[in-house]
């Protein structure tokens, strides 16, 4: 299973690192700042620590991944989805773990589901940098049950 990340800042990198340690082998990611010289080294180090392959666009992540975790600042969640979702293939699970508003999450869900994907709103309820991939996360949406099943081998704390 390929797990992709849209956004690879502190949250995504922490989750990816934990997943890698649990045995996830196929991790891919895109970050909008990856070509900004101020961030290239830091992002490269995070990718290396999680053994995550860099992709050139978020749409490429959606095209290749079975599960996509979008971990961008809340103000960018909808615009990130609009850029990523055109690459989505039917059956892909798109998980938004941002703190975007309910109205924005609904818009993202519509975008995902119109492409044949399944949406998950993931509300992280703990200390992410400490708990990493095991941060307690409340999940809802059309893809929630399947997301819990797919991620079970990685000992995430999803409900």
Task: Identify the residue ranges that each predicted region occupies.
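NAD(P)+-binding Rossmann beta1-loop-alpha1 motif at the extreme N-terminus of oxidoreductases
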Residues: 1-63
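Conserved beta-strand segments of alpha/beta enzyme cores
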Residues: 26, 53-54, 93, 118, ...
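Structural beta-sheet core signal
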Residues: 29, 94-96, 137
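Short low-complexity, flexible loop/linker segments enriched in glycine and/or proline
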Residues: 43-44, 71, 134-137
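Rossmann-fold NAD(P) dinucleotide-binding segment
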Residues: 59-119
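Rossmann-fold dinucleotide-binding core
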Residues: 100, 106-159
């Amino acid at each position: 299973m390929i797990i992709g990340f849209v956004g690879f800042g502190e949250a995504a990198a922490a989750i990816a690192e934990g997943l890698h340690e649990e045995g996830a082998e196929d991790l891919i990611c895109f970050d909008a700042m990856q070509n900004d010289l101020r961030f290239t080294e830091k992002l490269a180090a995070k990718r290396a620590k999680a053994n995550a392959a860099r992709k050139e666009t978020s749409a490429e992540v959606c095209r290749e991944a079975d599960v996509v975790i979008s971990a961008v600042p809340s103000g960018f969640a909808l615009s990130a989805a609009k850029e990523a979702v055109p690459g989505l293939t039917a059956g892909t699970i798109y998980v938004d773990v941002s703190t975007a508003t309910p109205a924005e999450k609904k818009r993202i869900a519509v975008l995902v589901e119109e492409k044949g994907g399944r949406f998950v709103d993931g509300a992280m309820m703990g200390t992410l940098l400490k708990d990493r991939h095991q941060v307690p996360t409340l999940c809802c949406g059309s893809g929630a049950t399947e997301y819990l099943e797919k991620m079970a081998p990685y000992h995430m704390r999803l409900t």
